């Protein structure tokens, strides 16, 4: 038989051999776990559209984070659901808002936990949009000041990282200036630089009670059909002072992740969003897929595509599986 071909299978002959030449590895420290803290809630409450994800009360937050620490997960991103909402999202930037209280609670008990604060208005506005609204139009420049106030209040509460997710033009510049003015020059910005207008966000909007009450978010979030626009968005945020770049969603946007990783040297964060999570959970519950294998394959693929960190609701399960 001719020996002119390459025998690639030599490096696949055993589990040990495959492990030796593995190019991409997952570790619990790669994961950022999202937590939904609800004002006025007693105990925990399941999110129906996101199996195994819960709303958590402030008094149970310590136990929730303690579990993450035991699993080796070193970072959380905090979302808050207030009791009261208004057209200006006042509770987003209130010094005693639910997210501010949650951040302080986590840092008091777990000072080494890296707390990322989601900086947006949609969970706090009665209309569900990420900025101020006038005559049905989401106002850009007028919303920036409120976002800056939100970021500063979160930093004062103890946030390690500010993560603005609103997709208003200029948000990184305004937030950076506000943080620096208040003395928070060492607080990094994890920018939702590339955030598409996606139907994969559906379960999250249930969890965060942030579904728009009119229209959609297509005037400020990106068109899923666009690729080059992602690089323009990322470039703007790099120039404005971002320290991390997020691509959201990620499972259907790995080409975008690779483009961004190839173009920029900042740490890249993949957001493995709620719809991606819930599809896997639903299929696994029906016995159509092997959940463990699918989840680890998806997360590995995101890292292979260029992600340095992954925001994922699978974090706890994945950390347990990686420890087996």
Swiss-Prot record:
SMART domains: ALAD. One of its GO terms (biological process) is protoporphyrinogen IX biosynthetic process. GO terms for cellular component: cytosol. InterPro entries: ALAD (IPR001731), ALAD_AS (IPR030656), Aldolase_TIM (IPR013785). The active site is at 195 (schiff-base intermediate with substrate), 248 (schiff-base intermediate with substrate). 5-aminolevulinate 1 binds at residues 205, 217. Keywords: Heme biosynthesis, Lyase, Magnesium, Metal-binding, Porphyrin biosynthesis, Zinc. GO terms for molecular function: porphobilinogen synthase activity; zinc ion binding. Its cofactor is Zn(2+). Zn(2+) binds at residues 120, 122, 130. 5-aminolevulinate 2 binds at residues 274, 313. Its EC number is 4.2.1.24. It catalyses: 2 5-aminolevulinate = porphobilinogen + 2 H2O + H(+). Mg(2+) binds at residue 233. Binds 1 zinc ion per monomer. Pfam families: ALAD. Pathway: Porphyrin-containing compound metabolism; protoporphyrin-IX biosynthesis; coproporphyrinogen-III from 5-aminolevulinate: step 1/4. Belongs to the ALAD family. PANTHER family: DELTA-AMINOLEVULINIC ACID DEHYDRATASE (PTHR11458:SF0). Catalyzes an early step in the biosynthesis of tetrapyrroles. Binds two molecules of 5-aminolevulinate per subunit, each at a distinct site, and catalyzes their condensation to form porphobilinogen. Homooctamer. This is Delta-aminolevulinic acid dehydratase. The gene is hemB.
């Amino acid at each position: 038989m001719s020996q002119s071909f390459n025998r690639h299978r030599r490096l696949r002959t055993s589990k040990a051999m495959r492990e030796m030449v593995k190019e991409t590895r997952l570790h619990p420290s790669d994961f950022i776990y999202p937590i939904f803290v609800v004002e006025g809630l007693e105990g925990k409450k399941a999110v129906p559209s996101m199996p195994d994800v819960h709303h958590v009360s402030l008094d149970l937050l310590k136990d929730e984070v303690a579990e993450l620490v035991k699993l080796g997960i070193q970072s959380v991103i905090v979302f808050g659901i207030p009791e009261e909402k208004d057209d200006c999202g006042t509770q987003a930037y209130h010094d005693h808002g639910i997210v501010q209280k949650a951040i302080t609670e986590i840092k008091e008990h777990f000072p080494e936990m890296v707390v990322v604060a989601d900086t947006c208005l949609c969970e706090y506005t009665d209309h569900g949009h990420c900025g101020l609204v006038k005559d049905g139009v989401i106002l850009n420049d007028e919303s920036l000041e409120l976002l800056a106030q939100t970021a500063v209040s979160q930093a004062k509460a103890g946030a390690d990282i500010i993560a603005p997710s609103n997709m208003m033009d200029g948000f990184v510049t305004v937030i950076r200036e506000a943080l620096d003015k208040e003395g928070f020059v060492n607080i990094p910005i994890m920018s939702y630089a590339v955030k598409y207008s996606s139907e994969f966000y559906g379960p999250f909007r249930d969890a965060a009670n942030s579904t728009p009450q009119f229209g959609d978010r297509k005037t400020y979030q990106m068109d899923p059909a666009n690729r080059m626009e992602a690089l323009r968005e990322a470039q703007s945020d790099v120039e404005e002072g971002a320290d991390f770049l997020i691509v959201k969603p990620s499972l259907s946007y790995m080409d975008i992740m690779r483009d961004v990783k190839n173009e920029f040297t900042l740490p890249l964060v993949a957001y493995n969003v709620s719809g991606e999570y819930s599809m896997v959970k639903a299929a696994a519950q029906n016995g159509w897929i092997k959940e463990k294998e699918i989840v680890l394959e998806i997360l590995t693929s995101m890292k292979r595509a260029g992600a340095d960190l992954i925001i994922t609701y699978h974090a706890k399960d994945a950390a347990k599986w990686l420890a087996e």
